[in-house]
């Protein structure tokens, strides 16, 4: 949306040019909560919820695989959470035949540390493990046309992430070699390639390495370096 705005291009022109230049997928960040009431209060300067959805429709039309996200647990209502899921489901239902559209959905709780919402408005992250588990389970039920539901171990930690694997999630995501957004807002959790596999096994599942497009790959033998975060 920002490129379109400063360059004076349409969504189709922008995404077509990016694909021609080699881009084959696009993350679903920036969805936050799609309600414009919420967006006006927590993400001024970002596009409207409808424009976010429109951009995703065009991305799917030109053959780009994307993901969809939700950042909840701040000022949104329960109804706005459900509306968010319904609108994402509707966009996925409109994807061209043969295209992936949204390949995954990821919900994570608002991380409040050092944010303006916390300092100015006193909004804190009060999302419990039970509430996050319910959010993942509801996402699985309400998004039957999105194959993969990813848990956000980065924001909720290993123990809660393990529970979500039994409650609708089928993907732990990546180990995130570098992440500077939610970690700056109080998400301290970290995994290595071996420790994330151990976590999955302890939950009763078999780890599977995958590509961005969820193609299975053989897990190589790795020697890990200790990284001081």
Language model: regions and residue ranges:
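Short hydrophobic alpha-helical runs that function as membrane-insertion/retention elements
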Residues: 27, 67-69, 171-175
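Auxiliary Fe-S-binding modules of radical SAM enzymes
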Residues: 85, 93-229
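Conserved non-cysteine loop/helix-boundary elements of the Radical SAM core domain that shape
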Residues: 1-64, 71-95, 120-127, 186-187
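Active-site-proximal loop/turn and secondary-structure-junction residues that shape catalytic pockets
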Residues: 1, 30-33, 70-76, 109-113, ...
């Amino acid at each position: 949306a920002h490129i379109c705005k400063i360059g004076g291009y349409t969504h189709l022109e922008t995404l077509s040019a990016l694909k021609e230049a080699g881009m084959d997928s696009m993350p679903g960040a920036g969805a936050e909560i799609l309600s414009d009431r919420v967006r006006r209060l927590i993400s001024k300067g970002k596009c409207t919820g409808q424009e976010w959805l429109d951009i995703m429709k065009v991305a799917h039309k030109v053959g780009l695989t994307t993901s969809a996200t939700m950042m909840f647990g701040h000022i949104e209502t329960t109804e706005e959470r459900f509306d968010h899921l319904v609108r994402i489901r509707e966009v996925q239902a409109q994807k061209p035949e043969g295209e992936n559209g949204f390949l995954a959905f990821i919900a994570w709780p608002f991380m409040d540390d050092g944010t303006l919402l916390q300092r100015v408005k006193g909004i804190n992250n009060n999302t419990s493990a039970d509430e996050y588990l319910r959010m993942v389970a509801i996402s699985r039920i309400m998004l039957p046309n999105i194959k993969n539901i990813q848990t956000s171990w980065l924001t909720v930690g290993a123990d809660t992430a393990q529970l979500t694997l039994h409650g609708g999630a089928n993907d732990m995501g990546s180990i995130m070699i570098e992440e500077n957004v939610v970690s700056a807002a109080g998400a301290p959790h970290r995994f290595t390639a071996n420790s994330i596999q151990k976590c999955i096994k302890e939950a009763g599942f078999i780890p599977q390495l995958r590509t961005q497009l969820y193609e299975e790959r053989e897990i190589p033998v790795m020697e890990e370096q200790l990284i001081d975060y």
